[in-house]
Design a protein with these regions (language model features):
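Short active-site oxyanion
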Residues: 46-53, 125-129, 178-180
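Short amphipathic alpha-helix with an adjacent loop that forms part of the alpha/beta core around
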Residues: 18, 87-94, 229-231
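Short phosphate-binding loop-to-helix
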Residues: 79-93, 113
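Conserved helicase motor
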Residues: 76-83, 159-163
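A contiguous loop/helix-start segment that scaffolds small-molecule binding in enzyme catalytic cores
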Residues: 3-8, 15, 23, 98, ...
Length: 304
């Protein structure tokens, strides 16, 4: 991508400049996850406005800025020096500087460095402000066909690189009726696929290299994920975001009336999760089945 024309940067300043950007504040700026055209106008404005940009990788960020015709002093802040570098940022903020933080791609602080930086800024009584933008998490959710509206979703990020611990984490996903979003790197994707195959028929939406030239979005049963990877040599390359769809545990038609009555009484007064938890403790019924029953009863009540 060639650098944006001066008129585009001027338009970004005109549109985004209508908002106040206080001095002495940290700006957490989302950057593209692949396609450079996904940069936000406010992101361009703030990256041009700030006194300094802290970043996960100075070489990567320098190249990114050059793509947009921007040049700023850079400060390395990554997982290995975040605590120390955060204090440097805090000092700059105390001096009244505006500082931006960007990770290598996407929204900083979400499975990327930046969270400890924000914690240090808040602890110092200073401001941290978000500039939302690209995120592989919401990108995949938007095309998965299950936005978590029927029970929410959980984001687990990267699972453990250790086999036993990762398999234990997959078991926890299996027991959770909600949708689950996770990330994985290319060198570990085959091992993760083998473990996720234990989820059997549970649907899985795969996002590979999202927004890039060779992006792929596919849906398979979890048990078929290893075979999907092996169907093309290119499929083990690139960054992955995965969505394990909500469990579809069958509701036991023979669940006793007393349990269902208890569930109804709890649902009348409490949120679904709390009602299900208490009903499971009272009745001993499986939480998965109770959760599905609760969702069905709430949906039926809304339609009546």
């Amino acid at each position: 991508m060639s650098a944006p024309s001066p008129s585009l940067l001027a338009a970004a300043r005109d549109m985004a400049g209508q908002q106040h950007y206080p001095q002495g504040a940290l700006y957490m700026v989302a950057t593209p996850i692949g396609n450079l055209a996904d940069i936000g106008l406010r992101a361009l404005h703030v990256l041009d406005l700030v006194d300094c940009i802290a970043c996960e990788d100075t070489r990567h960020t320098a190249a990114l800025l050059q793509s947009y015709g921007l040049h700023k002093p850079l400060l390395a802040l990554h997982e290995h020096n975040e605590a120390e570098a955060a204090q440097t940022v805090v000092q700059r903020l105390r001096e009244g500087q505006r500082v931006a933080y960007v990770s290598d791609a996407g929204t900083p602080g979400v499975s990327d460095p930046g969270a400890r930086l924000c914690a240090a800024v808040h602890a110092a009584g200073l401001r941290a402000l978000p500039l939302p933008g690209a995120s592989s998490i919401t990108a995949l959710l938007s095309v998965a066909g299950t936005g978590g509206h029927d029970g929410g979703f959980v984001f687990t990020g990267f699972l453990s690189p250790k086999t036993t611990e990762r398999q234990r984490e997959v078991q926890a996903i299996a027991a959770d009726p909600r949708a689950c979003v996770l990330l994985e790197a290319p060198h570990r994707i085959e091992a993760l696929a083998r473990d996720l195959a234990a989820l059997g028929e549970r649907p899985l939406t795969i996002g590979r290299e999202l927004t890039k030239q060779f992006e792929e979005v596919a849906q398979v049963a979890a048990r078929d994920f290893p075979a999907w990877l092996q169907a093309g040599a290119h499929r083990t390359r690139g960054e992955f975001v995965l969505l394990v769809h909500p469990a579809t545990a069958a509701i036991d038609d023979n669940m006793d009336e007393a349990t269902l009555r208890t569930l109804d009484l709890l649902l009348a007064e409490l949120p679904v999760k709390t009602a299900v938890k208490l009903c499971a403790e009272i009745s001993g019924a499986p939480r998965n089945a109770l959760y599905q029953a609760a969702l069905a009863r709430r949906k039926g009540a809304q339609e009546d």
